[in-house]
């Protein structure tokens, strides 16, 4: 039976992170739990809902090896409310656990670990390494354009496409297309990662340039190894939108605008808009100038920004929220 002692901050970090992958409501009670497995002084903490899994291994002071599943919400709340210091986990009878810290003792019931699903393993597939900050950046700059309505489920994720030694990360929601390109030496292949997985990766990835993430995928599973966490994800299947038909279209209209100035200008238009009052924002390009104009029942905004543009006057309208 499992017995160990651990610093509150260490176990709380592992529990709250892996709990994000635990099911919030399932007919299988084990899926609502966090799986604890102790071997020596290494405690492996896992949350898994059959779609997303997060695993972490931390150092503890082990007394007796064992395995136990605990309700994720309950164990996180208990540990969070414990005072700082060492917490002792003591399974004194099968599926009966004491948690002790200073003069506080909680006694809770565990869940049969035999009901807990096994994390997927990749028999074969593709893998590549990428710095954690770079992976964080490409996800962060494309995730906003992932579809949120499941009319075509494969679009509810971002496509990672390696082609001609270049990594393209693409998100499409039917209105916007976001693409980020980076050099990556690898054979051609592609896969689609669900938005939920990408959101969790954003929280876990570091800004430390020295840290490297390993991405491994097969036909329908992906594994992301990042520092002290391993993220498991079912991949999305289906025909992704062929963005090359739009992005590859020739155009003789091109303008270069200062990003900060443009964002500040478009942000000002939001003062004239609300849930009931909606209006497009007009962009007019002419002679190295971009005119941004928006008029509603509340008022109007008219501003000019310097830009690099030459050619005939060109006007186009956008939803301001999609520009931001």
Question: Residues of each region from the PLM?
Answer:
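Structural preference for solvent-exposed beta-strand-turn elements
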Residues: 1-324
